[in-house]
UniProtKB/Swiss-Prot annotation:
PANTHER family: MITOGEN-ACTIVATED PROTEIN KINASE KINASE KINASE 19-RELATED, SERINE/THREONINE PROTEIN KINASE. It is an enzyme of class 2 (transferase). The modification Phosphoserine is found at residues 411, 491, 747, 816, 1058, 1061, 1134. The gene is BCK1. This is Serine/threonine-protein kinase BCK1/SLK1/SSP31. It comes from Saccharomyces cerevisiae (strain ATCC 204508 / S288c). Present with 112 molecules/cell in log phase SD medium. It catalyses: L-seryl-[protein] + ATP = O-phospho-L-seryl-[protein] + ADP + H(+); L-threonyl-[protein] + ATP = O-phospho-L-threonyl-[protein] + ADP + H(+). Residues 29-49, 111-126, 298-320, 342-353, 659-671, 851-870, 914-925, 1058-1083 have a biased composition (Low complexity).
């Protein structure tokens, strides 16, 4: 059925002369009362001529040019335009001149010519004269429930979509919510392959047209609003016209004529003279406040929406047309005076004055009513009052006196008034002609058995449509049944039906459907129950009844029932509780609830709970022992909200496979869960909310945000029938929060397979699966495995093939236990080295150092099956690389090394390891390990050799015990010299690039992929927590995790330093120091002798060993690890709450990469500022409005930063999107360059290099307030006050600088562990000279947090939009969910912009907000921005006053964040230690 059928392809162009009627169309031809198909036996042409003659008789001043033939010739066009069967009223205002259509219709004498002229005035050569740009729908296209299947197909036809699309949407019932959800491509992609893609049928066109339909209808809706306000005046003017016509015409003709007001506004069919036309238009001057004919047309049409009838009633039917319609039998309600007129019913197919007009101009029900019953409802009052006091007369209905008979607004039908004596026959004819087919007897009627109004005895509220054939009962939940009259001695039993789609007007159909409701032959008496019952008939023997206990207390106990699920009820004795607090505690104890975040509600069996009971009301009920109540109390656990049943999978009727774009099951594996994009995080608050409908809840209007994909692994042990949403997550988190603890698998003692004295070569035995469960454990001295270092062991290199290829190092000169490492390598590619170890252990003379007792044991030993890696590629898309899979870097090198060594038939090994008082991980002999060359006393690292071409990467270690290495260092940063000299070794660059690419693209898909297997319990606990940005301390301790592509032990030169001193050499060889590096491929590494002076210094440029006196002057060098550790110590020693970050504006920036040696220039200018900064990029920690955000280390100062980068392709000058992104980044830089405030994320510097724009930001640990809300739940009011005050201070500072943020939301507020809240993400901020002036700006930001003036782009806006957004944030913190959580994006946008309404406060949240908090929200949600307070004014609001005793670190939220940070750190350590086999 056409939505708004184009008049094209039929050789008839829609004529402007009948445009007033062409936009009114009837309803379903099989059921509508005002059907377009008349059952009259007379020819249609004759009927039209007769109608036209009657019109001429009533209007004698018609122009002579308007002939009967002309009207007859134009009628087919009218009929065609009327032959539409949609139930929608559509007005199209395209009229250009108010007189052009009248004059053109009567321009010539011949009909076709006038019709042609009329076409020309209809818009020239336009195919569709009804302009889509000015289309107005009487129903709301933004409401998914309004999109019925009929409207969907009509919309497709109107926009020329192919029939295959229409059939597919019909076949799979894609309407309502399912139709609107197709706006999102993820939902549309499921069906796209089944729909043919053409120029006129594509997703892009479908989305644009659907959005345009929604937008245009709201944009033009102001016309409907204006017409609604003028409805009363227009009706009065039409009444005056009728009164004039009544004086000149007979009562019979007037009763049969169509609405005079419509004739006055649509004079083109009868063609009156200009004088009459002016008179008619003058009577409707209330609609003509503008000179625009288009506005006149639309307003007239809307105000007279009900005045149009079906196409058969486009002209009046005179009384001289005789139709053979049988006389209607006399109803016993009628008086004798009414029989005479009803014996000869009028012949008009529709009567315009029977039914009451619906007063809502924009209601979809009014258009539906007009389609069913014609127009002019309630226009004429009956000539004399109805004698029945309780009858449904149109007068009573119009005055609103019979409210009990009003139907529900959702009902598809509207009741008519009881016909008067003049109208009964006419109404009977309507019903008869519509139901002539299959009617056995047209004379069958139903007798109403009471002289009063029929009483309704059904339990449900019903509304009765009283007609002469039957009583049609329509359920009306909003209305109550009328009282039963006391004088009524008989009643008609009514059976209410639900959702009756059509009126079956025949008595036969009523008999078949409701055999007990309609009886034309006899009356139905009121059932009288004469049977008498006695109480004794129901009494049982006394022994079956319960016996009351006899106790010491004579007073009776009073019990109520409490429940937490409305299923299981527990009795609670009110006598045992005296105070309200004890009552609550007893109730919570009975139900097993261990917190007080609950609300109390009244309930009963098979009932829904009532509203939350305030404390004062609950106190009153307790004192009154819950009298006049059900005695049942429902306690709603706010920490564990009711969970919805999981909806059935979305399937179509013909089982079309609906594949999800992102497979949720693929997230179950430990590897692929890391690769999931964090774009899902934005689903909660961002533009993809179009797809966030609950399919099964669309009827009730409940909609929640879609759960991000990475949450699906969180509750893998929950009931599979439950839906995964935020409440599931919060439920699990609440239990963990109540008892925060970390449970790790304990690890057995690290066993060292020590060699026998007589063995030549001993290979360490891998630790088994049961032994590899690592955790914190202190290694104690094992008496049976002690090594006697007084007896030298035999060298494993006595075999010829294992003979050393270079000179052995000198033996240690002192007796202190030192560990040195000797690695050997044959550089020929054929003779490769097989890694093997032989372990010796020093004799201990004292217990382990204290730091080892608290530090984790690094157990990185592995079996061949435990192919694990310390870092998972492609894990940079999450806030923290999670989970940090793997344990041994030896495994990570397996694939690359085997590629280069698989052709070698013989593997050779040469390695020597001396052990001191430290625990050392052993390496399995069949794997190759990297080549660290220098190991120091306290490090716990894997030590082995590998090929020269191998690429060095750090092992999975923690530096928790690293600080003692700097105890001997000077306090000055520049004083550290040779103690940090590292013998470096270059790696092969091409192989590095290839391996990096392989790691990034392989996704662990090869046979030796890096995987780690956790048991489900451990994995769930770890992944659930790893969602916040770690603190800088955690990053400093785990640099290799967050900077996986950096060489942390690469020496960085700081400049010329003094010659090496013995003291620095001692510190270099001190067991407290930890460092490792790599050497040149052509340079064999050489251990450092453990004495105070050594003989050689390595020169990495020429690869030769030079004596000390011939070496170049040594330079001060530090490793990145050293610099970071110094910064970590300085941070710990800092006592300032606000730690200052070094700003780098206007300073040269140098990025540290692994491809070249970087020299740190610490020279300062006259202002004491560094002239140059070196920085290093790490893992991705988030995505902002533009580009990605990475972790960043300021190598010059050691500070942790964040860098936002936008990469611009080389040839992107024509790409507007990229240009706008770069421009936004430049704007962000210029706007925020000079900002410095505690509650604003600092911007530290900017760099543009190699088409990459880098913006350096302050690093804020913790997480956003939005993510905390989603994981933790709603906040307490003192905490909300604490955060709101900080945000207000930041906003006041921004506004004082003339900056509008324009995208304030909880996700853009960062909260660290110290409770400091910072405003971030200024990607769309704007700098303005006058921030409080309503300047014309574009709509930016996220819809749900937008102020009304931002959505209404015609109205400018100011900095007050940030105040509105702040109110949304406060509401979000109170409610635990985003504002407008029950609406999707499009609906919320129109709700804000059109209705100018603030987001509603959820019912369960309202009791939790104090009166001061409500006042604060009301101030923020002031619709008029002029009256909305500024940030400084809100700082003086009582809500902004934070209690002095408030301590953020003592709140549960702070403990929650801290436990997450500890768990993150522990997770990093565990993954470095844990080796599990499959």
């Amino acid at each position: 059925m056409p939505f708004l059928r184009k008049i094209a392809g039929t050789a008839h162009t829609h004529s402007r002369s009948d445009s007033n009627s062409s936009v009114k169309f009837g309803h379903q031809p099989t059921s509508s009362v005002a059907s377009t198909k008349s059952s009259s036996k007379s020819p249609r042409a004759t009927s039209r001529k007769s109608i036209y003659d009657d019109i001429r008789s009533q209007f004698p001043n018609l122009t002579p040019n308007s002939t009967s033939s002309q009207f007859y010739e134009s009628t087919p066009v009218i009929e065609q335009s009327f032959n539409w069967t949609t139930d929608d009223h559509i007005s199209a205002g395209t009229l250009e001149n108010p007189t052009s259509f009248t004059n053109s219709s009567y321009k010539n004498d011949n009909g076709p010519s006038s019709l042609s002229d009329s076409r020309k005035s209809s818009g020239g050569n336009s195919v569709n004269s009804l302009s889509f740009d000015k289309l107005i729908l009487s129903w709301d296209p933004t409401d998914p429930d309004e999109w019925t299947m009929h409207r969907v197909t009509s919309w497709f036809k109107f926009h020329d979509f192919p029939e295959s699309w229409i059939l597919f949407f019909k076949k799979h019932q894609l309407f309502g919510h399912r139709f609107i959800k197709l706006l999102a491509y993820d939902n549309f992609a499921v069906y796209e392959k089944y729909l043919p893609q053409t120029k006129t049928a594509s997703y892009t066109r479908f989305q644009q047209l659907l959005k345009k339909t929604m937008t245009k209808n709201v944009t033009n809706s102001h016309i409907r609003q204006k017409s609604a306000s003028k409805l009363k005046s227009s009706r009065s003017s039409s009444e005056s016209i009728k009164s004039k016509l009544k004086n000149s015409k007979s009562q019979e003709d007037i009763s049969n004529s169509r609405s005079t007001s419509e004739s006055a506004l649509s004079p083109t069919k009868s063609g009156p003279s200009k004088t009459d036309e002016k008179n008619f238009l003058h009577s409707t001057s209330t609609h003509q406040k503008t000179k625009s004919a288009s506005s006149l047309y639309r307003r007239s049409f809307i105000s007279l929406r009900g005045s149009s009838s079906s196409n058969a009633s486009s002209a009046k039917s005179p009384s001289n047309i005789k139709l053979s319609i049988p006389a209607r039998p006399h109803s016993i309600i009628e008086s004798n005076s009414t029989l005479t007129k009803s014996a000869s019913p009028p012949a008009s197919p529709s009567y315009p004055s029977i039914f009451r007009r619906h007063h809502k101009s924009s209601s979809s029900e009014s258009s539906l009513l007009n389609s069913l019953f014609g127009s002019g409802i309630g226009e004429e009052a009956p000539t004399k009052p109805n004698p029945q006091g309780h009858s449904l007369s149109s007068e009573n209905l119009a005055k609103g006196k019979s409210k009990h008979y009003e139907t529900n607004v959702s009902s598809p039908l509207k009741q008519s008034s009881l016909p008067t004596s003049d109208d009964k026959g006419n109404l009977w004819n309507k019903f008869k002609r519509k139901s002539q087919i299959g009617v056995p007897s047209p004379n069958t009627v139903a007798y109403v058995t009471s002289q009063e109004t029929p009483s309704l005895k059904s339990n449900s509220s019903t509304a009765t449509l009283t007609v002469q054939t039957a009583d049609v009962n329509i359920p009306s939940p909003s209305s109550s049944p009328p009282p039963i009259p006391k004088t009524a001695n008989r009643s008609l039993e009514v059976i209410s039906t639900e959702d009756t789609p059509k009126i079956s007007s025949t008595t036969a159909s009523f008999k078949e459907t409701y055999p007990d409701c309609i009886n034309p032959d006899k009356t139905v008496p009121v059932p009288v129950n004469n049977q008498k019952y006695s109480v004794k008939n129901f009494l049982l023997d006394q022994k079956f009844y319960p016996l009351k206990k006899t106790g010491l207390n004579d007073s009776e106990n009073k019990y109520i029932l409490v429940t937490k699920d409305n299923v299981s009820f527990v009795p609670l004795n009110l006598k045992s509780v005296a105070k309200l607090s004890s009552f609550k505690e007893s109730a919570l104890t009975k139900l097993g609830i261990n917190h007080k975040n609950v609300t109390f509600h009244m309930t009963d069996f098979d009932c829904d709970i009532g509203a939350a009971i305030p404390d004062d009301t609950l106190e009153f009920l307790k004192k009154s022992l819950f009298l006049n109540t059900s005695g049942k109390i429902y306690i709603k656990d706010q920490m564990k909200l009711q969970q919805k049943p999981k909806p059935a999978p979305l399937t179509s009727e013909n089982n079309v496979p609906l594949k999800s774009v992102k497979s949720k099951s693929s997230m179950r594996s430990g590897t692929s869960s890391l690769i999931a994009s964090t774009d899902d995080v934005s689903i909660v608050t961002s533009s993809s909310d179009i797809t966030s409908f609950d399919e099964h809840a669309s009827g009730s209007g409940r909609r929640y945000p879609q759960t991000p994909s990475y949450y699906y692994d969180r509750v893998s042990n929950t009931n599979p029938t439950e839906e995964l949403n935020y409440w599931n997550i919060k439920e699990v988190l609440s239990h963990e929060e109540n008892a925060p603890k970390m449970v790790f698998k304990t690890s057995p003692k690290l066993e060292l397979n020590l060699p026998d004295k007589g063995s030549k070569l001993n290979i360490p035995t891998p630790i088994t699966e049961n032994e590899s469960k690592s955790s914190f454990q202190v290694l104690r001295k094992d008496e049976g495995t002690e090594i006697d270092f007084n007896h030298r062991r035999e060298s494993p290199y006595t075999k010829p093939e294992l003979a050393p290829k270079r000179e052995a190092p000198k033996p240690p000169a002192n007796t202190s236990p030192q560990r040195t490492l000797s690695t050997s390598k044959q550089n020929k590619p054929i003779r490769l080295v097989r890694a093997s170890t032989k372990i010796s252990r020093s004799k201990r003379s004292k217990p382990l150092p204290p730091q080892l007792l608290s530090s984790p044991i690094e157990a990185s030993s592995s079996s061949p099956d435990s192919l694990t890696s310390s870092y998972t590629p492609a894990s940079t898309h999450v806030l923290i690389p999670q989970p940090y899979k793997g344990a041994n870097d030896v495994m990570r090198r397996l694939k690359t090394d085997q590629d280069s060594t698989s052709t070698s038939p013989s593997l050779k090994m040469k390695q020597k390891v001396n052990r001191s008082n430290s625990t050392v991980s052993t390496s399995n002999s069949i794997f190759y390990s990297p080549s660290p060359l220098l190991k120091r006393g306290n490090s716990k690292r894997v030590v082995s050799s590998t090929s020269a071409a191998d690429i060095f990467e750090e092992n999975d270690i923690t530096f928790a015990d690293a600080p003692p290495m700097f105890d001997s260092d000077d306090s000055d940063d520049d004083s550290s010299s040779s103690d940090d000299i590292i013998w470096s070794k270059k790696k092969t660059a091409p192989e590095t690039n290839n391996e990096n690419k392989k790691d990034e693209k392989s996704d662990n898909s090869s046979t030796h992929s890096d995987e780690i297997f956790y048991d489900s319990q451990t994995q769930d606990k770890m992944e659930r927590k790893m969602t916040f940005r770690p603190s800088p301390e955690v990053v400093y301790q785990n640099l290799e995790k967050f900077f996986p592509r950096a060489n942390l032990d690469k020496p960085i030169t700081e400049g010329i330093a003094s010659p090496t001193s013995p003291k620095s050499l001692d510190s270099l060889l001190s067991p407290k120091n930890v460092a490792s590096s790599r050497t040149e491929p052509s340079t064999p590494s050489r251990p450092v002798p453990p004495d105070s002076s050594y003989e050689f210094i390595q020169d990495g440029l020429n690869g030769k060993n030079k004596p000390l006196n011939q070496a170049k002057t040594p330079k001060r060098t530090k490793t990145i690890r050293t610099i970071a550790h110094e910064a970590s110590l300085a941070r710990k020693n800092s006592v300032k709450l606000k730690r200052q970050n070094t700003k780098m504006w206007g300073t040269r920036m140098v990025e540290v990469t692994e491809n070249h040696m970087v020299s740190i220039n610490k020279a300062k200018n006259s202002k004491g500022e560094y002239k140059e900064f070196a920085w290093m990029k790490g893992e991705m920690i988030g995505k902002g409005s533009f580009g990605a955000v990475y972790l960043c280390l300021n190598v010059t100062t050691g500070e942790m930063m964040a860098v936002k980068q936008v990469e611009v392709p080389k040839y992107s000058s024509q790409n507007e999107a990229i240009l706008s992104t770069v421009e936004a980044l430049r704007s962000e830089v210029s706007t925020l360059k000079d900002l410095d405030h505690l509650n604003i994320v600092q911007y530290l510097g900017f760099e543009n290099k190699n088409n990459i724009y880098s913006l350096f930001l302050e690093y804020v640990a913790g997480g956003s307030v939005g993510s905390l809300i989603r994981m933790y739940g709603r906040f307490d009011e003192p905490l909300i006050k604490h955060l709101t005050t900080q945000v207000l201070k930041g906003l006041a500072y921004l506004h004082s600088k003339g900056i509008l943020h324009r995208d304030m939301k909880a996700d853009n507020l960062l909260l660290d562990q110290d409770g400091i809240c910072k405003i971030s993400d200024f990607g769309i901020s704007r700098k303005s000279k006058d921030i409080y002036s309503n300047s014309d700006m574009t709509m930016r930001g996220t819809v749900f947090w937008m102020a009304p003036e931002m959505v209404d782009t015609k109205q400018g806006y100011s900095a007050k939009v940030d105040i509105w957004s702040l109110g949304c944030i406060v509401l979000e913190m109170f409610a635990g969910k985003r504002p407008w959580s029950n609406l999707e994006v499009v609906a919320a946008m129109f709700k804000i912009g059109k209705s100018k309404s603030a987001p509603p406060i959820p019912e369960d949240t309202l009791p939790l907000i104090s009166q001061i908090g409500r006042n604060f929200l009301d101030a923020c949600f002031e619709i008029n921005p002029e009256k909305r307070p500024t940030a400084n004014e809100l700082l003086s609001h009582p809500f902004s006053e934070v209690n002095e005793t408030f301590n953020f670190k003592s709140t549960r939220l702070a403990k929650f964040i801290k436990s997450n940070d500890k768990l993150n750190s522990s997770k990093l350590r565990i993954t470095s230690q844990e080796n599990k086999t499959e």
